[in-house]
Amino acid sequence: MENTPEGTIESILNFCHYCLNDDLLLDYLDFFEERGIGIINASPLSMGLLSQRGTPDWHPAPEPLKEACARAAAYCTEQGYPIEKLAVQYSTSLNPRIATTLFSSANPENVLKNISYVDEPLDMEMVAKVREIIGDQIRVRWKNS
């Protein structure tokens, strides 16, 4: 981006770097703002890492990260607080500098649930506990991420 003429890039699509297991995007907010580049955040569920269903077989994350996220999802289930809800709330409510977050689902009911989660208050104690469970796997990336 440093080598492109100013104004050439209007926005970027970031995925899996502003979610419960990875907040790397925060390190780049000033860079984008200084250049007038808008940010679209995507995949608050980290491509399925942060789901009760579990990580898809094709997911490129390393096993220790998959296992840490599975433990976090199990904890959330035990607490009666779906990790999907916490993940969507975290990605949409904590940082006003990130105005747009995209998520997808093949199930229309899940889309409606995700939309409703945005209007509910975020439980910061749950966020802290989940991030504690993920532990040293926070910000662990995989190829092409």
What is each of the regions a protein language model found here?
Residues 1-144:
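Beta/alpha (TIM)-barrel catalytic core signal, keyed to glycine-rich beta->alpha loops juxtaposed to Asp/Glu
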